[in-house]
């Protein structure tokens, strides 16, 4: 099984009044990793991908600070449904896990806005890349 990783810079604007990365920014880090995954692994043109985030849950383990410089975000596929993919993520600083997350994406028919089967080429790439 292969895990996709993306290095994301910690920006000054990510820091809140407590001096660490604001909790909402973790979802942005995960989104940045996911969009890179779509481009790098699925070779998908994001302007042509009709997929929405149906749910996300994040468990925070330790704060991330500006001085950490960057985080590594992992992307794994835990489950493939007919029209959905459940992805798991870790946000890491070095070897330390700062957060763990699970996100479910749903493929939509761009005409109706209703769930539609995942594109076969995306399903095949995810199965191959992650050994599903």
Question: What is each PLM-predicted segment?
Answer:
Residues 1-55, 110-132:
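Hot-dog-fold acyl-thioester-processing enzymes
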Residues 7-9, 57-59, 74-76, 90, ...:
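Residue-level recognition of well-ordered beta-strand positions that form the cores
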Residues 12, 18, 26-29, 60, ...:
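Broad hydrophobic/π-residue packing in well-ordered secondary structure
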Residues 37-72, 77-79, 98:
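Hydrophobic beta-strand-centered segment that forms part of the acyl-chain substrate-binding groove
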Residues 65-67, 78-132:
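HotDog/MaoC-like acyl-thioester-processing domains
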């Amino acid at each position: 099984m292969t895990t996709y990783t993306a290095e994301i810079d910690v920006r000054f604007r990510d820091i809140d009044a407590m001096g660490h990365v604001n909790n909402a920014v973790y979802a942005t880090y995960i989104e940045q990793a996911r969009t890179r995954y779509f481009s790098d692994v699925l070779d998908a043109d994001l302007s042509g991908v009709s997929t929405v985030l149906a749910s996300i849950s994040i468990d925070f383990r330790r704060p991330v600070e500006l001085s950490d410089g960057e985080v590594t975000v992992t992307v794994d596929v835990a489950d493939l449904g007919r029209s959905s993919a459940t992805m798991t993520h870790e946000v890491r600083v070095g070897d330390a896990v700062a957060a763990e997350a699970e996100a479910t994406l749903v493929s939509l028919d761009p005409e109706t806005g209703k769930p539609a089967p995942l594109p076969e080429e995306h399903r095949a790439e995810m199965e191959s890349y992650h050994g599903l």
